[in-house]
Amino acid sequence: MNPSSTKVSWATVTLLLLLLLLPPALLSPGAAAQPLPDCCRQKTCSCRLYELLHGAGNHAAGILTLGKRRPGPPGLQGRLQRLLQASGNHAAGILTMGRRAGAEPALRPCSGRRCPSEAASSVAPGGRSGV
């Protein structure tokens, strides 16, 4: 028997050990069951990240932009939840939700007197009013 043919590389041994030990560890009941944190169960804190991670669907875009988004009105949160829980990939809708919610509101007309911004814009460059 040739001694060089019986040598096994450490990489092969490591790979075999991983293949033998990893599947039982992943299939064990302790690894599969992830208990809900107390704050989420009692609703004492915001569990948005936990809900994103454990909900159904593709949440990559929502998780990546979670820290960049400003807290919005409750309607925005509800729309995000509907997008996340629906089937399919809604990355484009999720990524543009913050932009749409942060859009400038339409200007409302002033009641009664003229608006200060209008009065300032109607002054001629020489300092005389164009009114």
From Swiss-Prot:
Organism superkingdom = Eukaryota
Q: Which residues carry this modification: Pyrrolidone carboxylic acid?
A: Q34
Keywords carried by this UniProt record: Amidation, Cytoplasmic vesicle, Disulfide bond, Endoplasmic reticulum, Neuropeptide, Pyrrolidone carboxylic acid, Synapse
Coarse class of the protein's main subcellular location:
endoplasmic reticulum
Q: Which cysteine residues pair off into disulfide bonds? A: C39-C45, C40-C47
Task: Name any one GO molecular function.
Answer: type 2 orexin receptor binding
Biological-process GO terms, alphabetical: eating behavior; neuropeptide signaling pathway; positive regulation of cold-induced thermogenesis; positive regulation of transmission of nerve impulse; regulation of neurotransmitter secretion; response to starvation; sleep; temperature homeostasis
Q: How is this protein named in the record? A: Hypocretin neuropeptide precursor
Which organism's genome codes for this protein?
A: Bos taurus
